[in-house]
Amino acid sequence: MFCPIGCDPRGRYALNLAGRPPFGKWVPRDKSCHIRRSQPSPSRGFALACAQQKETLMRAILERLLSFDTVSSKPNIALMGYLQDLLAEAGIDSTLIPDPSGGKANLYATVGPQGVPGVMLSGHTDVVPVEGQAWTVSPFALTEKDARYYGRGAADMKGFAACAIEAMVLAAKRPLKVPLHLALSYDEEIGCMGVRSLIDMLEAAPIRPRMCIVGEPTAMQVATGHKGKIALRATCVGREGHSALAPLALNALHLAADFVGVVRGLQARVAATGLRDGDYDVPYSTLHVGKLNGGVQVNIVPNSAVIDFEIRSLAGEDTEALIADLRAGAEAIVAPLRAEFPETEIRIERLWDYPGLGTPSDAGVVNFVKSLTGANGTIKVAFGTEGGLFDARLGIPTVICGPGSMAQGHKPDEFVSVEQIERCRAMLAELVDRCVAGF
């Protein structure tokens, strides 16, 4: 179905054709930090067109969301402009929080009474790359077959976003006593980076949401926790030389290999004697080396090597102690070498992090969302979410509950089943009813 809501948000942005950067990008007309939208662009009628064609609004929204290539390295502002227009058509005011480039933004919207804490539906709009994957369908288009919706982000997590936006539009027609909030972010896939400016905005607000449902894929089970993550880098400095005289140089890749051994040794210790939580697939904190770069060609002894690694920690894990152990291990490697190679070092730096989530299983938000879904128990998930930031920085009680499985995320031919989407729509319809009743 063709959507009359276009991809360029001209009501809020102007295309920069001036002789200065950012060239050819949409930039805010007023250059303000937050861009509000409460009136639709002229000649818009998307929701009405969907109703007339007997197509669910959710499916039409999902089709458009999947059509936007919002890989984290690319802008998402066209997608956000589309959503602002769609929400405005339903009479819903929304706010964009752009990044410094103007190419990416978070979106925040509220339906219902002002000045009352409500329920926040949270998701991200960015997706992981498709390069190098053997897709049999177009990744940036909706393909429906075998009772599944295919496309990059269908499971993680544009399927939930489409359901949440539909719920907001339908809720706008109802007399809510408790408001419904929508929070959509960028750059979640590269460290939950984008949502932090949205959290800054909420932190300064007089009233914060009462609770939050992060719609990451859990097969509609209610998840109360995930591990925290710290991304780190170790830069190994040796001394360059000709490979014919290799013993007279100091190979930085050898230093890196020794440091990887330190990481693996610490992982073995944590697995054997560290904290445990049997609710996770991997019941202990983990250390993982994901990337190693070094060397130019085979006949040059490299003087530099870089290791990117991570710690995924259980709640209560002393991660600073783990990092101290890593630094001590690095020092033990280089200390004996400094007399001959005083420049040698293994420098460890923290790149970014996000906190874990550990909502008590008897918390009000847990019981409330279980009552919406009919779930009896709870789970914890292996992947990270923005939920830990909402909890840690804003004190918002948070759970994770959304359609699909992360087993389908980040893979070629990513999909979410129609059955999972319908269960999510039913949960959100019940949520809207509860907001009308005041819970």
Annotate each PLM feature.
Residues A51-R152, K173-L176, G395, S405:
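Acidic/His- and Gly-rich active-site-bordering loop/insert found
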Residues F2, L15-L17, L48:
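Leucine-biased recognition of intrinsically disordered, low-complexity hydrophobic segments
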Residues A51, P100, R233-F439:
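Metal-dependent amide/peptide-bond hydrolase catalytic core
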Residues D146-Y149, A155, G159-G265, H410-R423:
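Fold-level recognition of mixed alpha/beta catalytic cores in primary-metabolism enzymes, strongest
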Residues R12, L17, F23, K31-H34, ...:
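Short terminal hydrophobic/aromatic SLiMs and anchors at protein ends
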